[in-house]
Amino acid sequence: MNQQRGFTLLEMMLVLALVAITASVVLFTYGREDVASTRARETAARFTAALELAIDRATLSGQPVGIHFSDSAWRIMVPGKTPSAWRWVPLQEDAADESQNDWDEELSIHLQPFKPDDSNQPQVVILADGQITPFSLLMANAGTGEPLLTLVCSGSWPLDQTLARDTRP
């Protein structure tokens, strides 16, 4: 009698099941980014886009533009004139987009060397020549305090963005 050599269907299915389980464990462990990191990146992208628009506005208008940071949001500010003096006023181009400047509720914001506050003075000023007040903005998980992302401005565009768990070279 001729004996066949090869794998039975049961052996093949067992190997496929083991490979599938191993792959799913690896993807679950390493391939999934937590929600807070994703929101930090999305918020950083929105803030970076707003900062770029503020730089363009300062350059094109020839006037400084400020950015005011509070615990709940950032606001673009421009010089406004009153009868006695000038002061910083929020830029009101589109009130419908005002919510786009809010920080995500799951994020804690740490601004260095300044602190977010409720005054009407910007902590960061962008001059008409493109110079920016140097700052560092750390976004952390509000619940755990775990650092998620850092944006650093050394005085000019572009910002340096670093993820806390960044493993890229």
UniProtKB/Swiss-Prot annotation:
It is a single-pass membrane protein. The keyword Transmembrane helix applies. Residues 1-6 form a propeptide. Cleaved by prepilin peptidase. Keywords: Cell inner membrane, Cell membrane, Membrane, Methylation, Protein transport, Transmembrane, Transmembrane helix, Transport. One of its GO terms (cellular component) is type II protein secretion system complex. It comes from the Bacteria. The modification N-methylphenylalanine is found at F7. It is found in: Cell inner membrane. InterPro entries: N_methyl_site (IPR012902), Pilin-like (IPR045584), T2SS_GspH (IPR022346), T2SS_protein-GspH (IPR002416), TypeII_GspH (IPR049875). Belongs to the GSP H family. This is Type II secretion system protein H. It comes from Escherichia coli (strain K12).
